[in-house]
């Protein structure tokens, strides 16, 4: 059992028969009354997100999540296909469940598949990935305003803000946790 006050982003727990992943968690102390935990949660099975509050002392059953190394094979229609790199078993995951993760991976990329018992519940991507700029505005000579930048569409469809000197065709390192530009590759 785990108390609501100990729940952090990324943790998974069971409540009311649902498997729930914490997206955001924060303590909130109103001017009057007891402390509450405000949380943004995702139902792992349906993909729906919702906001809720809990008392800090409420207890939940922490879900045991196992991960296995896998390779992203391809996407067809509404299904993404992955292969366990140890056993060569293949897994089909609805695109709706891994839509955000697919923005960071290319075919044949290494990932980790998450299991709850024998049920596939998600994919973990590396903390940084290397992607190529598919489209961006041309650089303007003399544009030296610091902190500006421009949007760039990467080969997976992800749009990130990049410095003005970045051009189409360049490879970039992207932080997958925040979806931000780190450096040129």
Swiss-Prot record:
GO biological process entries: peptide biosynthetic process
Origin superkingdom: Bacteria
Pfam families: EFP (PF01132), EFP_N (PF08207), Elong-fact-P_C (PF09285)
GO cellular component: cytoplasm
Transmembrane segments: none
Pathway: Protein biosynthesis; polypeptide chain elongation
CDD domains: S1_EF-P_repeat_1 (cd04470), S1_EF-P_repeat_2 (cd05794)
Gene3D superfamilies for the chain: 2.30.30.30, Nucleic acid-binding proteins
Keywords for this protein: Cytoplasm, Elongation factor, Protein biosynthesis
UniProt subcellular location: Cytoplasm
InterPro entries: Elong-fact-P_C, NA-bd_OB-fold, Rib_uL2_dom2, Transl_elong_fac_P/YeiP, Transl_elong_KOW-like, Transl_elong_P/YeiP_cen, Transl_elong_P/YeiP_CS, Transl_elongation_fac_P
One GO MF term: translation elongation factor activity
Family: Belongs to the elongation factor P family.
Primary role: Involved in peptide bond synthesis. Stimulates efficient translation and peptide-bond synthesis on native or reconstituted 70S ribosomes in vitro. Probably functions indirectly by altering the affinity of the ribosome for aminoacyl-tRNA, thus increasing their reactivity as acceptors for peptidyl transferase.
The protein, known as: Elongation factor P
Lineage summary: Bacteria, Bacillati, Bacillota, Bacilli, Lactobacillales
């Amino acid at each position: 059992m785990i108390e609501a006050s100990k729940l952090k982003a990324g943790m998974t727990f069971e409540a009311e028969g649902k498997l729930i992943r914490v997206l955001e968690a924060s303590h909130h102390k109103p001017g009057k009354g007891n402390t509450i935990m405000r949380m943004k949660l995702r139902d792992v099975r349906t993909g729906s997100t919702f906001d809720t509050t809990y008392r800090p002392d409420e207890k939940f059953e922490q879900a045991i999540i196992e991960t296995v190394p896998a390779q992203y094979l391809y996407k067809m229609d509404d299904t993404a296909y992955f292969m366990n790199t140890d056993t060569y078993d293949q897994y089909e995951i609805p695109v709706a469940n891994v839509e955000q993760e697919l923005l960071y991976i290319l075919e044949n990329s290494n990932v980790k598949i998450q299991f709850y018992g024998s049920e596939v519940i998600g994919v973990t991507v590396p903390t940084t990935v290397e992607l190529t700029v598919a489209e961006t505005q041309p650089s303007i000579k003399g544009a030296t305003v610091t902190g500006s930048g421009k949007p760039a569409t990467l080969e997976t469809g992800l749009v990130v803000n990049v410095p003005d000197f970045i051009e189409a065709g360049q490879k970039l390192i992207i932080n997958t946790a925040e979806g931000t530009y780190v450096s040129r590759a």
